[in-house]
């Protein structure tokens, strides 16, 4: 019986833990699979997918900066992916690509089930409006966030995300320069790649964003999460959480879509957190 082929596409991709996570899930569930990583620039993504299919590829995860490009290659989309305008999970169904987005449910599961947080009634600040932000925003709203303010260095993209979410009474877009005038938030989510370019000694956000209950969450993990979480520690947010748990949970959702069974995430998370987790408070 041939081994099923899966992959993760991104640019860069060398840091990705997805091959290891899915291999561990397969071992746990008794599923034989081959999971590869492909470093692909956006302009080569569609052709790379065609080669992947020709070589027996069945499903793929998609990370930055390809999530919106993945949305465009899909013939069918889940309601979550359509609402997000971004895809992180591709499945080959009847000769075409079906797109799903498991980022949001992965984040919510990590925050509510692993860290015991209640998201209902919270005021949230979402930093970023790209593929990562698009993936998590709908799920945060569905989890009960009362108000979401989206801030992005390119205000046009923030406006586009607000329009896509379709909830003008709960979601608004503001300029990055307005951060000091927005009041405080119970949840601050970093969905930018600023951790890849910022020195942890210079990254900062206004203290006026905080109250005594503020939870700071970075969708990145490892070294990319250090600047944001270092700031969170310095200003003493109530909790500071990196994106490793979300990564494992969204991977489990993808695995379930492909194989019909959801693996136990705790053993995989525990091992990876001991190796890659950024020290935090939770």
Swiss-Prot record:
**Residues bound to NADP(+):** 128-132, 219, 243
For whether the record's keyword set contains Amino-acid biosynthesis, the answer is yes
Keyword NADP listed? The answer is yes
Task: List the transmembrane segments.
Answer: none
Where along the chain is the active site annotated? 67
Q: Which GO terms describe its biological process?
A: amino acid biosynthetic process; aromatic amino acid family biosynthetic process; chorismate biosynthetic process; shikimate metabolic process
Under InterPro entries, the record lists: Aminoacid_DH-like_N_sf, NAD(P)-bd_dom_sf, SDH_C, Shikimate_DH, Shikimate_DH-bd_N, Shikimate_DH_fam, Shikm_DH/Glu-tRNA_Rdtase
The annotated pathway is: Metabolic intermediate biosynthesis; chorismate biosynthesis; chorismate from D-erythrose 4-phosphate and phosphoenolpyruvate: step 4/7
Which Enzyme Commission numbers does its entry carry? 1.1.1.25
May I have one GO cellular component term? cytosol
Spell out the molecular function terms from Gene Ontology. Answer: NADP binding; shikimate 3-dehydrogenase (NADP+) activity
Key words, A-Z = Amino-acid biosynthesis, Aromatic amino acid biosynthesis, NADP, Oxidoreductase
Which enzyme class, named as a word? oxidoreductase
Which Pfam families does this chain map to? SDH_C (PF18317), Shikimate_DH (PF01488), Shikimate_dh_N (PF08501)
The reaction(s) catalysed by this protein are: shikimate + NADP(+) = 3-dehydroshikimate + NADPH + H(+)
Positions binding shikimate in this chain are 16-18, 63, 88, 103, 221
PANTHER family on file: BIFUNCTIONAL 3-DEHYDROQUINATE DEHYDRATASE_SHIKIMATE DEHYDROGENASE, CHLOROPLASTIC (PTHR21089:SF1), SHIKIMATE DEHYDROGENASE (PTHR21089)
| Family to which the UniProt record says this protein belongs | Belongs to the shikimate dehydrogenase family.
Role according to the record: Involved in the biosynthesis of the chorismate, which leads to the biosynthesis of aromatic amino acids. Catalyzes the reversible NADPH linked reduction of 3-dehydroshikimate (DHSA) to yield shikimate (SA).
Instruction: Summarize subunit and interaction data from the UniProt record for this chain.
Output: Homodimer.
Please state what the protein is called: Shikimate dehydrogenase (NADP(+))
Q: Which organism is it from?
A: Xylella fastidiosa (strain M12)
Task: Quote the gene name from the UniProt entry.
Answer: aroE
